[in-house]
């Protein structure tokens, strides 16, 4: 085990100097992975009773307004201020672009799928003290397809990027809208 804590860390990548970053859900979307570190969990502090403090969110922003549970009010997509802030609290995948096929502005920035907002968020990683801060970049992709739930991004040897999605109307807070009869993946 490299580190402990967080909630649903579904994306992981390294920048060009070997620093680990991962994406998560509920209690923040971007974390700097430090070996041996302890991070906040969704419920409780875990079993590390002698830890002075946990390492906080790397991002200086959230992709939603209010509490993460407010997402349950929305059915098809992020609305209002949450839409403007980046789409919601659920993120999957995490790709730090190190290729040379895209414009230089994307190099060493992290891309992550926002499953509620039907988009790919982009955060700009900047050095701050002994760590990093993630600043909100412009959303890279916004889908108008209600079935779109991005999962991963990865770049190939030529610098081109491949993305996968989970085409389904349901997601993690929807128990009756999941479309299970098509077998689509």
Task: Please identify what each model-predicted range represents.
Residues 1-185:
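Beta-propeller domains with acidic blade repeats across secreted/periplasmic ectodomains
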